[in-house]
Structures are given as structure tokens and as C-alpha cells.
Amino acid sequence: MGNLCVDVITLFPEMFSAITEYGITSRAVKQGLLQVTCWNPRDYTTDRHHTVDDRPFGGGPGMVMKIKPLEDALVSARQATGAAAKVIYLSPQGRKLTQQAVKGLAEQESLILIAGRYEGIDERFIEAHVDEEWSIGDYVLSGGELPAMVLIDAVTRLLPGALGHVDSAEEDSFTDGLLDCPHYTRPEVYADQRVPDVLLSGNHAHIRRWRMKQSLGRTFERRADLLESRSLSGEEKKLLEEYLRERDDS
């Protein structure tokens, strides 16, 4: 896992300034850990209207992105990035993007992301060029740009040196298959609500157990499906039982 080069084929390259100019991803760009290059299919059209879409065969509403501009943009991206780059189409028909999937993508040296628009892109382009399809959820967006940015952000967090603290990525939600524990900062008391005493104790073993217990309890209450695919250790089972007992007694 090292530096990452991401090429994005998109009709709206300006949107990706959110990645290159703000936050952790911007810092990764400045550090040379992340490179983001956009390729606009409109730049590969030959008509005066720069047409990139057409009516779907068989009728129906909406328009479909044409093959040729996409294919020509992909050729340019491949030449710049390297033929080995994995081509990913952000699509509601794709597999759901999980933290485990993000870890796998972070192992790549280069990615080419296809951000579709309208009713989608010509299926023949997908069959000929796309290696993987990924979805960020079971809902409809106006295009693939936001999912592409989500993927870039998630992968960037796993690049060595991208985060301010070496342990930050390891402690994120989903990293070990669980939701994150609650976090607190100063002041110790706000509107009669106190920070849990254990976090002020300085006892790192107790703090670790408390955080694990809260993480397990939160996951059980909010995303029990995550626990179904995870084998709990003896300590984790005991902590979850403690959490549920304390919850029921309160």
C-alpha cells in the first residue's frame, strides 16, 4: 500500500475540487500520496455540440451516454496511468462498497473511475472495459461523481501518511467490523452531562475495555447484521453481555 493515482472519467471535472482542495484528501494530494486527474468525454467529441449522450434503443425516458467519447477518454486515461489500472464503474447495479472492499482498492497503485450520468452508460462499454462495479448504497443519485468522491476519500484514509495520527484509520468505524465507540472532548461537564469517568481515569486498560464494550453495544443496537458475519472473542462476548445488562438495568 503506497501512493495512489486516480483517473476519473466525468462530465463534471470541477466537482472534484472538493477532493483536491479540501480536507484530508487535499493534504494527501499536496504530500504526493494521491494524484487525481479528470478526463471529460466532451473533450473527445467531434460535433459542435459536444454530444455525449443519445436516446436509448427500445424507447423509454432519459438519455444514455455514448460509447465513443467514453472509450476515447479511457484510452487517454490508460496512456497516462498505465494499462494495469483497474477500471471501476460507480453504479447502483454494483456490489455495495464496504470497508473491506476499500482495503482491497487501497492496495492498487492506480484506479480509473467511470462516473456515469443520465440513465447510465452504454452496456457495451461496461462489457468491454469495466473490471468492477461498485455502489455506495441502495438509493438513486444524479450521477457517479459523488460515489467516486466517496470511494477516493475512503481509500485515501488508508494510505500511509494520509492521516494525522498513525492509529486514526485503524480506529475508524467498520475497520474491525464494528461501529465506533462514543468520543468526547473538553469541557468535562456540559449542560449537566458529564464525560464518562473511565475516560478521565488514565487507566488505559480500562479505557480500552470501555471503548470495546461501547463499540460492541452500538453495533448490536444499530447494525446487528455486522455481528452476524463476525466471530466474537471470549472477551468481546463478555463485554457485550455487560453492555446489555447495564443497558437493561439503567
UniProtKB/Swiss-Prot annotation:
Compartments, record wording: Cytoplasm
Keyword Transferase on entry: yes
Biological process (GO), any one: tRNA N1-guanine methylation
Gene3D superfamilies, per the entry: 3.40.1280.10, tRNA(m1g37)methyltransferase, domain 2
Keywords: Cytoplasm, Methyltransferase, S-adenosyl-L-methionine, Transferase, tRNA processing
GO terms for cellular component: cytosol
Coiled coil: none
GO MF term list: tRNA (guanine(37)-N1)-methyltransferase activity
Protein residues bound to S-adenosyl-L-methionine: G116, I136, G137, D138, Y139, V140, L141
UniProt-listed Enzyme Commission number(s): 2.1.1.228
Free-text function comment from the UniProt entry: Specifically methylates guanosine-37 in various tRNAs.
Family: Belongs to the RNA methyltransferase TrmD family.
Subunit and interaction comment: Homodimer.
Protein name in the entry: tRNA (guanine-N(1)-)-methyltransferase
Gene: trmD
